[in-house]
Regions:
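Structural signal for interior beta-strand "rungs" in well-ordered beta-sheet cores
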Residues: 1-54, 58, 200-202, 206-304
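Terminal amphipathic alpha-helical/low-complexity segments used for targeting or macromolecular assembly
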Residues: 49-204, 289-307
Length: 307
């Protein structure tokens, strides 16, 4: 402030976690075994094992998530993976390079088509047809992304998966195609249109008639329902997973008929926005929250809002 930029050392302690869009400001330290929730900030002072949510931050109760499996003996699938598991993850992570490679191929194909049209038809007709070419490439990008999603993970289901498991890696692989292929070639040009609804439906999102969607951040698509005439604003995240104690927990998110999740808000797993209700911009709908029918809630975390 005041024309000055502040810098400082920031520390995140051992086995601590800062959620998506969480902030640990300059000069602050998050003690070990602690958690800062999505869209939340780290307080000035923290104790080991403390958990925080909201902005300004408040203490939060937390239940430890464990994987009760012989394969996770000695935390082999969470904190202490063996060499074979690391190698397997490395193979899948390397496959994420396929996404930018395919996107580059689409760019090369687009330029090749433009060159052919220019040579055969001249500039005026090429200019008139250029939009159709881009629409065709967008359709190809979307089709490939849908195919990769169904090959990698099939249908998403509510469940818990340790960090060092094939499902988590393959889920990240298909999400890379969403971000690197489908987003620049399709989603980012179709916000608020019927086409984005078609693309999200193909990935598994249940979308009602007349829904207006201005975001493609629907991570585990099959776990999301957007009702008829509902609104999902720009920059919103319908987040169907949480990573806690290095376990990926998946659950449903429901946005009922006529309801609104306003701009730059986040809805966490197991949450529900009731019929004809509104969650204001920049809000955090916590895990398991239920916004009642015909209500207006806002805040981080959300609370009833009197207009």
């Amino acid at each position: 402030g005041g024309g000055w930029m502040r810098t400082g050392e920031t520390k995140v302690g051992k086995r601590s976690f800062v959620g998506n869009s969480g902030i640990t400001a300059p000069g602050r330290k998050l003690s070990k075994n602690s958690l800062v929730a999505v869209l939340s900030s780290t307080p000035k002072k923290t104790k080991a094992g403390a958990n925080w949510w909201g902005a300004p931050p408040e203490r939060m109760r937390r239940v430890t998530v464990e994987v009760n499996s012989p394969a996770n003996s000695g935390e082999a699938l969470t904190y202490n993976p063996g060499l074979a598991v690391k190698a397997a993850r490395g193979v899948v992570e390397t496959m994420r390079l396929l996404a930018p490679m395919f996107s580059a191929m689409l760019l090369a194909a687009t330029l090749s088509v433009y060159y052919s049209l220019l040579d055969a038809l001249g500039f005026p007709l090429t200019w008139l047809l250029s939009g159709l070419v881009l629409m065709g490439m967008g359709a190809v990008a979307m089709a490939v992304t849908v195919a990769v999603k169904w090959i990698c993970v099939g249908k998403h289901r509510a469940a818990d998966h340790p960090l060092w498991s094939a499902f988590v890696w393959l889920n990240e692989l298909q999400d890379t195609f969403v971000e690197v292929v489908a987003a620049p070639w399709f989603f980012q040009h179709t916000y608020g249109s019927g086409e984005i609804n078609l693309g999200l439906r193909a990935l598994g999102v249940e979308i009602g008639r007349g829904a207006w969607i201005d975001s493609y951040w629907f991570p585990e698509t099959d776990l999301i329902r957007v009702g008829e005439a509902a609104t999902v604003g720009p920059g919103t995240v319908v987040q169907t997973h949480l990573f806690q104690d290095r376990v990926m927990s998946l659950d449903t998110v429901t946005i009922q008929d006529g309801s609104t999740l306003a701009a730059h808000s986040v809805a966490l797993p197991a949450s529900l926005i009731g019929t004809a209700s509104t969650v204001g911009p920049g809000s955090l709908v916590m895990r398991g929250d239920r916004v009642p029918t015909n209500a207006v809630w806002q805040g981080n975390p959300i609370e009833p809002w009197k207009r």
